[in-house]
A protein has these predicted regions:
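Alpha-helical interface subdomain recognition
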Residues: 1-69, 107, 133-148, 152-157, ...
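Amphipathic alpha-helical regulatory segments at dimerization interfaces
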Residues: 18, 22, 43, 90, ...
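Signature of the chorismate-utilizing enzyme
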Residues: 55, 75-76
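Amphipathic alpha-helical segments in well-structured domains
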Residues: 58-62, 81, 97
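Short secondary-structure capping/junction motifs at helix and strand boundaries
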Residues: 75, 94-101, 110-112
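N-terminal glycine-rich flavin-associated loop
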Residues: 76-94
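FAD-binding core of flavoproteins
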Residues: 102-258, 385-387
Length: 387
């Protein structure tokens, strides 16, 4: 295991830190409200950072997302790189790569994802409509994405229908982060096939989340979609998403802790800085250890994927740390600010909101542990990169 950044990864991280630091200021973030920052997105794409992910790999992306998390910059960087750039690069056909990748790298194509993790937002197939419902009609209180069976092609040697490369999807994805900015959305059906839908071919309504992620509710009613990859694509993209968003959480926690350290070093009580108090030191130390645990597990999962090793369980581990420990860290960051931490306009409150949102997005810690336990019980990882 060697997490030492390559020269290219270090250069990309340094450039990202400079751009995020210059443009994702407290004043600009406050002015943006719950929307994204188009000027910052243009700067990132113009600097070649989105396209650079193809060269620096998932570990490089984790490093870049750490810098985004430190500043809580409101751009669809993680979603576009995970559900767009890396997914299309790894699983798209030659025609899909040629058609989609140029737009993704220059920022004109923004991709959202409808299935981040177990226990979070996920699209699943419903199968055939229940009795009394017409084809393509969503039953009340049932959500998910269904790829109609007749859209497939029948294999004469098999009883089942294998999906064609195009289908019409019906269903609802309750929350898709950055949907308001997206030109495409990647969703999964119950058979874990991935489908790429043009946002303009679907209906959506804005949804406000804990963090300002420009989210929306995606409604698919016979929307045309193209399949991305084969049966192994779902597991890889899911593991990639868990790893990447864990890296984003590591940055959010690092930013929250850095603000808490600065505050407690300058704020005095009874003539002494708050940082000299033992209770403050212990809480800050615990938060630091939690942040490092998130970081190192995300690094390991990313490194394993980049080197072609099994990473499913490692991505789950990173997601668990990001969910459970991340929540502890952002609470600590707010608590160490005392009364100032309760101010909704204080910069540290933004880290608190992002940390809680990532906690929810990655999924409940108990469910992640259950999934990890089932994987360990099976005794092996089903991972396309080992084949």
């Amino acid at each position: 295991m060697d997490f030492t950044p390559t020269q290219e990864q270090a250069a990309a991280q340094e450039l990202a830190a400079r751009i995020f630091g210059d443009l994702a200021t407290h004043e600009r973030l406050s002015a943006a409200g719950t929307g994204s920052d188009p000027e910052l997105w243009k700067a990132l794409c113009g600097a070649g950072l989105v396209g650079a992910v193809q060269e620096v790999g998932l570990l490089g992306l984790v490093l870049l997302l750490e810098e985004q998390g430190r500043t809580t910059a409101q751009v669809p960087f993680a979603a576009t790189c995970v559900y767009g750039l890396l997914a299309v690069s790894a699983h798209g056909s030659a025609e899909q790569r040629e058609r989609l990748l140029p737009g993704i790298t220059d920022g004109s194509v923004v991709v959202g994802g409808g299935f981040p993790a177990q226990g979070g937002v996920r699209a699943s197939a419903r199968g055939e409509p229940p009795a009394g419902h017409q084809q393509g009609v969503q039953a009340p209180h049932q959500q998910g994405v269904r790829a109609p069976r007749q859209q497939g092609v029948r294999d004469p040697h098999q009883q089942d229908v294998r999906p064609s490369t195009h289908a019409e999807l019906t269903g609802t994805v309750p929350v898709v982060p950055w949907l308001r900015d997206a030109t495409h959305v990647l969703v999964a059906d119950a058979d874990r096939n991935l489908w790429l839908v043009r946002a303009g071919d679907a209906e959506w309504q804005p949804v406000e989340l804990t963090a300002p992620w420009a989210a929306g509710r995606l409604v698919l009613d016979g929307a045309e979609a193209e399949q991305l990859g084969g049966s192994d694509a779902y597991a890889d993209v899911l593991a990639t998403a868990r790893t990447a968003f864990a890296g984003l959480q590591a940055g959010v926690c690092a930013g929250s802790l850095a603000r808490a350290v600065a505050h407690t070093n300058t704020r005095e009580q009874f003539g002494r800085p708050l940082a000299t108090k033992q209770a403050v030191q212990l809480r800050a130390a615990d938060a630091y250890m939690d942040t490092e645990a998130i970081r190192v597990t995300a690094y390991e999962a990313a490194w394993r994927r980049d080197t072609g090793l099994a990473c499913t369980s490692h991505a789950l581990t990173a997601a668990w740390w990001a969910s459970e420990a991340g929540r502890r860290v952002v609470h600590t960051g707010q608590h160490l600010h005392g009364g100032a931490g309760a101010d909704l306009d204080h910069p540290v409150h933004r880290h608190f909101l992002w940390g809680r949102q990532l906690d929810a997005y990655l999924g409940c810690g108990d469910e992640l542990l259950q999934e990890l336990g089932e994987l360990i019980k099976e005794g092996e990882e089903v991972d396309a990169w080992d084949r």
